[in-house]
Amino acid sequence: MTEWLPRRRLDDLLRRLRSLHVAVVGDFFLDAYYDCDGRLDEPSLETGRNCYQVVRTRRQAGAAGTVAANLVALGAGTVSAVGFRGDDGEGWELQRVMDGLGLCREGFFVAADRFTPTYAKPCYVDRDGGGWRVREGLERIDIKNRRPTPRVLQ
């Protein structure tokens, strides 16, 4: 352990974290990973451009959700999400991920007039033994709310 944080101090902080109720306030994004096999690429009939062929999908909580997931991984007693999602498919996926983490969602709202912020992250993958290895990230697609957050959600 580095000098600025002795091991004993870190152990004490992590032990105390188990008894805390931590609220994470912010923008919760869905990180949507699309693992593509480049050997299966084919041209689009509509545009002639390349169509990436997805062989696996993964979902994770992003942005404030990453902070919440890290607190859970560190053993925080209770982690509450304070924010909102849209009433859309991405929102349901984000909620499923959050529930899988065990986050408290009492302060997490569904807003019908908002998108669930999403980073769609396609990448090329290769087989690596029994699993997959990311070879190259492709162009990301961002879904964000471009209008100010309504007061009722702030």
Residue ranges and their predicted role:
Residues M1-R16:
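Short coil-to-helix leader/linker segments, especially the first N-terminal amphipathic alpha-helix
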Residues V25:
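Generic enzyme active-site microenvironment
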Residues W4, S19-V22, L30-Q154:
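Conserved N-terminal subdomain of the carbohydrate kinase-like
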